[in-house]
């Protein structure tokens, strides 16, 4: 939430910290949620490295192109390291990224609307199952608490895959130290999501 971003900025300025902000999902925000770029706040531009790319907003996963904005002295040093490793992004990816930025943006909005439909479908299905989750205000993932299944998240995912063929990832891969959460993605078409949810429901009744 913007209020938390402002608190982080206040701490960064107080203790003279550099902030690294991954804003890859900045354009995939839903309903009453709001994205605030920390580098846009007062006196934060000179202490913020903002990372972004094209894989999420423009569905260009595999083109392997992104960008960084930040203080010139830091970015210059980062560029030197980058040149020692891989020189530059391939030419067609650069042209593709330019076309994405300069071209019509209607497709981005349509994609976002479709993600939102899938998001709401998943939320309704999880409510029906009885799983709790954090409000997914952006991106295309839902972090879901599965403790009322009687299993740890790791065992839940393993058993679900073995018995139903549905692949989910436990939150332990993303910082969940209590093994209570799974990460559910709604990138797939709605019919596949519906089938997966039905399989999860049947799995819980076994």
Regions inferred by a protein language model and the residue ranges of each:
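PLP-dependent class I/II
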Residues: 1-206
């Amino acid at each position: 939430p913007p209020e938390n971003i402002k608190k982080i900025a206040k701490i960064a300025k107080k203790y003279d910290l550099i902030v690294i902000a991954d804003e890859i999902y900045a354009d995939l925000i839903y309903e009453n949620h709001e994205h605030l770029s920390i580098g846009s706040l007062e006196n934060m531009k000179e202490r913020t490295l903002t990372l972004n790319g094209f894989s999420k907003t423009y569905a260009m996963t595999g083109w392997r192109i992104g960008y960084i904005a930040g203080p010139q002295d830091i970015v210059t040093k980062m560029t030197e390291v980058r040149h020692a490793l891989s020189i530059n992004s391939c030419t067609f990816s650069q042209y593709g990224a330019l076309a994405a930025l300069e071209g019509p943006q209607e497709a981005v909005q349509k994609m976002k609307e479709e993600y939102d439909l899938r998001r709401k479908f998943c939320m309704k299905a999880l409510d029906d199952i009885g799983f709790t989750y954090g409000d997914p205000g952006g991106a295309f993932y839902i972090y879901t608490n599965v403790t009322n299944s009687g299993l740890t998240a790791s065992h839940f995912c393993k058993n679900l895959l073995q018995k139903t063929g549905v692949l989910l990832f436990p939150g332990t891969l993303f910082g969940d130290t209590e093994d209570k959460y799974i990460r559910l993605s709604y990138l797939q078409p709605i019919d596949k999501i519906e089938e997966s949810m039905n399989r999860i429901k049947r799995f819980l009744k076994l």
